[in-house]
Curated annotation (Swiss-Prot):
Kazal-like domain span: 4-54
Residues marked Reactive bond 3 (site): 16-17
UniProt-listed InterPro entries: Bifunctional_prot_inhibitor (IPR051597), Kazal_dom (IPR002350), Kazal_dom_sf (IPR036058), Prot_inh_Kazal-m (IPR001239)
Free-text comment about domains: Avian ovomucoid consists of three homologous, tandem Kazal family inhibitory domains.
The protein, known as: Ovomucoid
Biological source species: Leucocarbo albiventer (King cormorant)
Listed SUPFAM superfamilies: Kazal-type serine protease inhibitors
Gene Ontology MF: a single term: serine-type endopeptidase inhibitor activity
Sugar-bearing residue positions: 43
Transmembrane parts of this sequence: none
Keywords recorded for this protein, A-Z: Disulfide bond, Glycoprotein, Protease inhibitor, Repeat, Secreted, Serine protease inhibitor
Amino acid sequence: IATVDCSDYPKPVCSLEYMPLCGSDSKTYSNKCNFCNAVVDSNGTLTLSHFGKC
């Protein structure tokens, strides 16, 4: 199981770096910051499916 440490988030502004992650909602997030903010918004229901595009 792939995991991402989101303890540093949410951050108000995410960088533009592109390191895609695929969430359990089948959406591709452009980087860890955007993914972690979505995890926080989902109250922890969103998980990482795998690294890379969905």
